[in-house]
């Protein structure tokens, strides 16, 4: 319906903002990740949008980055999750952090996001694990070995085409204390060729 808006930012007060496009003010709801990077009121802005129509309401959601909109849509495909929790996810963690949490199955960290309990977090991991690599923005892979380094290596291996479980196993087995993420990935790929 409405995939993108380009106009002047007329109003911003979390979670709402208004964009003036040719004299028409579009009211959108947006996650905090979008609010952090919005320009000042009166400046030009381009937002990716998601249009949602229910029996009794019509809503428009705005995102500065396409990856955020994609994550917003995919999270809502999980049984029992709607726009409110999807916005909470994007307000609580970055897209890359969410991909790592899903890939590593970190239920505890997911339950720290408002509105997500243990059962919902478990359901998210099960239903989104195969798509987690699609969430990642492809940020540079750096850092020391640890839970985040293993998760980053796992995501990178998934982006290379490995199944989530196989990528996680490869990253765990290849990592040694003190290795950088790039080294873990290289060792995992070398081991896969043997």
UniProtKB/Swiss-Prot annotation:
Span list, region Domain I: 1-64
Domain II: annotated span: 65-140
Database matches in InterPro entries: DNA_helicase_Holl-junc_RuvA_I (IPR013849), Hlx-hairpin-Hlx_DNA-bd_motif (IPR003583), NA-bd_OB-fold (IPR012340), RuvA (IPR000085), RuvA_2-like (IPR010994), RuvA_C (IPR011114), RuvA_C_sf (IPR036267)
Record key words, sorted: Cytoplasm, DNA damage, DNA recombination, DNA repair, DNA-binding
GO biological process terms, semicolon-separated: DNA recombination; DNA repair; SOS response
Region (Flexible linker) residue spans: 140-144
Region (Domain III): 145-194
GO molecular-function terms, A-Z: ATP binding; four-way junction DNA binding; four-way junction helicase activity
One GO cellular component term noted in the UniProt record for this chain: Holliday junction helicase complex
Subcellular localization, as worded in the UniProt entry: Cytoplasm
Major localisation: cytoplasm
Quaternary structure and interacting proteins, as annotated: Homotetramer. Forms an RuvA(8)-RuvB(12)-Holliday junction (HJ) complex. HJ DNA is sandwiched between 2 RuvA tetramers; dsDNA enters through RuvA and exits via RuvB. An RuvB hexamer assembles on each DNA strand where it exits the tetramer. Each RuvB hexamer is contacted by two RuvA subunits (via domain III) on 2 adjacent RuvB subunits; this complex drives branch migration. In the full resolvosome a probable DNA-RuvA(4)-RuvB(12)-RuvC(2) complex forms which resolves the HJ.
UniProt function note: The RuvA-RuvB-RuvC complex processes Holliday junction (HJ) DNA during genetic recombination and DNA repair, while the RuvA-RuvB complex plays an important role in the rescue of blocked DNA replication forks via replication fork reversal (RFR). RuvA specifically binds to HJ cruciform DNA, conferring on it an open structure. The RuvB hexamer acts as an ATP-dependent pump, pulling dsDNA into and through the RuvAB complex. HJ branch migration allows RuvC to scan DNA until it finds its consensus sequence, where it cleaves and resolves the cruciform DNA.
Domain notes from UniProt: Has three domains with a flexible linker between the domains II and III and assumes an 'L' shape. Domain III is highly mobile and contacts RuvB.
Family listed: Belongs to the RuvA family.
Protein name as it appears in the record: Holliday junction branch migration complex subunit RuvA
Organism: Xanthomonas campestris pv. campestris (strain ATCC 33913 / DSM 3586 / NCPPB 528 / LMG 568 / P 25)
């Amino acid at each position: 319906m409405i995939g993108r808006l380009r106009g002047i930012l007329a109003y911003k007060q979390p979670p709402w903002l208004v964009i003036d496009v040719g004299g028409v003010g579009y009211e959108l709801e947006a996650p905090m990740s979008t609010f952090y990077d919005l320009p000042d009121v009166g400046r030009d802005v381009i937002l990716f949008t998601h249009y949602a129509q229910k029996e009794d309401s019509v809503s428009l959601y705005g995102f500065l980055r396409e990856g955020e909109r994609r994550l917003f849509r995919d999270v809502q495909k999980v049984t029992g999750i709607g726009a409110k929790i999807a916005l909470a996810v994007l307000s609580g963690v970055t897209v890359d952090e969410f991909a790592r949490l899903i890939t590593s199955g970190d239920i505890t960290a997911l339950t720290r996001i408002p509105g997500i309990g243990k059962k919902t977090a478990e359901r998210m991991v099960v239903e989104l694990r195969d798509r987690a690599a699609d969430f990642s923005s492809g940020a540079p892979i750096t850092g020391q070995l640890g839970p985040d380094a293993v998760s980053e290596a796992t995501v990178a291996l998934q982006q290379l085409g490995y199944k989530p479980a196989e990528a996680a196993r490869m990253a765990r087995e290849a990592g040694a204390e003190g290795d950088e993420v790039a080294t873990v990935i290289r060792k995992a790929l070398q081991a896969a060729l043997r």
